[in-house]
């Protein structure tokens, strides 16, 4: 604790110089959460138009694509997408109705699944997407979502002034929210469940002790955690607690904190494994920010902390902050090993006081990977089994195939396997240097770039759903080849249904690996040739190509074959 307070004091001495001396300590971290809250309530971040026809739905989609393109340019790697709004959703739920932000009419479909669309678009850009679930508030008392929920569970909703809230003291609240989160995780390839307002309303009249109140909120978190992790243990559990956990020995929270005021025992959730990640809402300055950020780090228990920054205060309509308030906070967070999250998307992309330019051109100039959840799994995937390069006029195409196993030989069970691509003018490529990252978290198996005048060296790694990264498969520039034609045109191969015999033109010493690919050019089976016979018994029925990778990492297509059932009409 004393050491971090010394850092805090020294940091303030450095703020006068815009934080540059501290920034030089680790200017380009390879692992860092860089997040943004993308708010859908009222369309305040997105969407700004309604989907009431096929054409208007496409306009809505194009707006989100444009937003994500700009976030990608700023090297944002995590999008917190508001999914459950106020007892309403942006996806077809069996529990709650559509929110009106998409179609303009509460309860009416916009004609497409906005959550699925957002997931697809985020993943195309190498970004994680977390379903942001607003938990306790359910909107105005007479709003559509609140009315529908009150009809089904009249005793579950409490009224405070004009607003409705799920009762945090009712056992059914945790069960209901857990089922909603289970529905999302079962149906969608989300990377996280992000709980918002998982606390008592600050105006709640407590009739129980604060310890009992904290126990009630923790039981809700436990139920949601169990539901999510039972379905997919690689899905991150996170929440956005009040930005100051509690009063510190030297700094007062001014009565606004998570632990005492609203019964959020968020640091215990990290310790007990109920949360993988926290996004504390630290919309403060000075001694209401810096020491409390250190406190979150000191009580992170090896988990991920990415404080939320109140960049909306840069807008003169919202506050009177200066850009230096935000930049000094960013420098501080990086130096103590925390990530950052911007509240919210509009204020980042509107570039108030140049904040977007600062992040894009300077602070987040290079990509970063989301830290792995080693507390859930620390198995290391096998490195890509093949990596080859092909040069055509003016372009260079890098191709690779993944193993579907960990280094210990067990199968990778996460549904998606990702790759990171590195490039450098030096060999071997230093994959610990974020400046060499050119493509992150991609599900593609090839990359085409313009051919430069100087030699470029490449390396590719594999990551699983937990974020564990393999050793690098390095490719020396001497491996560059033209389109391989050694074995002539690909031919039709015959099969017994359980095995294939390699063509007579192929010698075992020519092949390092045999790869079976489907018609989408995805590797479905990788093996080493033995006795010229390739066992395909475990491959599903279908049409495939058989490919050979030689010891120079050059891949050739040997031919095509049909696995038995695909031949039936």
Identify the role of each PLM range.
Residues 74-110:
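Aromatic-lined carbohydrate-binding/catalytic grooves of carbohydrate-active enzymes
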Residues 128-140, 194, 213-259, 304-308, ...:
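Aromatic-lined carbohydrate-recognition surfaces of secreted/lumenal glycan-active proteins
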Residues 31-33, 37-62, 130-187:
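Active-site-adjacent "subsite" loops/lids of carbohydrate-active enzymes
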Residues 358-411, 467-483:
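Pro/Thr/Ser/Gly-rich low-complexity, intrinsically disordered linker/stalk tracts
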Residues 266-267, 271-289, 303-376:
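Substrate-binding cleft of secreted/luminal carbohydrate-active enzymes
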Residues 62-88, 187-190:
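Catalytic domains of carbohydrate-active enzymes, especially glycoside hydrolases
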Residues 449-469:
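Beta-strand-rich modules
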Residues 482-487, 543-569:
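C-terminal tail/sorting-segment detector
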């Amino acid at each position: 604790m004393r050491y971090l307070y010394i850092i805090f004091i020294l940091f303030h001495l450095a703020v006068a110089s815009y934080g540059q001396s501290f920034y030089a300590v680790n200017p380009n971290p390879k692992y860092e959460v860089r997040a943004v809250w993308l708010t859908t309530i009222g369309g305040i971040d997105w969407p700004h138009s309604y989907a009431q026809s096929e054409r208007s739905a496409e306009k809505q989609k194009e707006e989100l694509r444009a937003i994500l393109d700009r976030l990608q340019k700023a090297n944002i790697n995590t999008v917190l997408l508001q999914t459950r709004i106020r007892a309403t959703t942006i996806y077809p739920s069996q529990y709650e109705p559509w929110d009106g932000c998409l179609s303009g009419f509460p309860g009416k479909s916009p004609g497409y699944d906005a959550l699925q669309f957002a997931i697809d678009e985020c993943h195309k850009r190498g970004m994680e997407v977390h379903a942001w679930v607003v938990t306790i508030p359910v909107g105005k008392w007479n709003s559509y979502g609140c009315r529908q929920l009150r009809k089904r569970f009249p005793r579950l909703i409490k009224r405070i002034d004009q607003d409705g809230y799920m009762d945090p003291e009712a056992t059914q609240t945790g069960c209901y929210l857990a089922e909603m989160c289970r529905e999302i995780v079962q149906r969608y390839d989300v990377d996280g469940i992000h709980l918002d307002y998982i606390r008592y309303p600050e105006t709640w009249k407590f009739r129980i002790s604060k310890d009992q109140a904290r126990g009630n909120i923790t039981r809700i978190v436990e139920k949601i955690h169990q539901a999510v992790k039972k379905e997919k243990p690689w899905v991150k559990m996170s929440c956005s607690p009040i930005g100051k956990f509690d009063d510190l020995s030297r700094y007062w929270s001014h009565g606004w904190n998570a632990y005492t005021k609203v019964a959020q025992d968020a640091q215990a959730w990290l310790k007990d494994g109920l949360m993988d990640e926290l996004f504390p809402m630290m919309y403060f300055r000075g001694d209401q920010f810096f020491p409390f950020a250190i406190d979150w780090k000191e009580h992170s228990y090896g988990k991920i902390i990415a404080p939320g920054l109140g960049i909306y205060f840069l807008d003169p309509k919202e506050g009177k902050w200066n850009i230096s308030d935000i930049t000094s906070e960013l420098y501080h967070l990086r130096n103590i090993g925390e990530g950052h999250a911007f509240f919210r998307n509009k204020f980042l992309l509107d570039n108030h006081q140049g904040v977007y330019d600062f992040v894009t051109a300077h602070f987040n100039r290079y990509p970063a990977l989301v830290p792995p959840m080693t507390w859930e799994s620390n198995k290391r995937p096998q490195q890509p089994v093949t990596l080859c390069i092909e040069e055509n006029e003016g372009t260079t195409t890098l191709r690779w195939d993944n193993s579907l196993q960990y280094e210990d030989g067990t199968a990778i069970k996460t549904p998606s396997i990702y790759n990171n691509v590195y490039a450098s003018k030096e060999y071997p490529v230093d994959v610990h240097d974020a400046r060499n990252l050119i493509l992150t978290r991609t599900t593609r198996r090839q990359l085409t770039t313009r051919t430069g005048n100087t030699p470029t060296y490449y390396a590719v790694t594999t990551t699983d759903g937990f974020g564990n990264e393999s050793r690098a498969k390095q490719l020396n520039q001497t491996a560059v080849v033209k389109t391989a034609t050694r074995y002539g045109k690909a031919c039709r191969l015959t099969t017994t249904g359980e095995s294939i015999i390699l063509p007579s033109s192929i010698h075992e010493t020519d092949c390092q690996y045999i790869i079976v690919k489907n018609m989408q050019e995805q590797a479905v089976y990788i093996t080493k040739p033995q006795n010229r016979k390739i066992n395909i018994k475990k491959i599903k029925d279908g049409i495939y190509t058989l490919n050979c990778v030689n010891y120079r990492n050059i891949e050739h297509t040997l031919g095509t074959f049909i696995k038995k059932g695909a031949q039936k009409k």
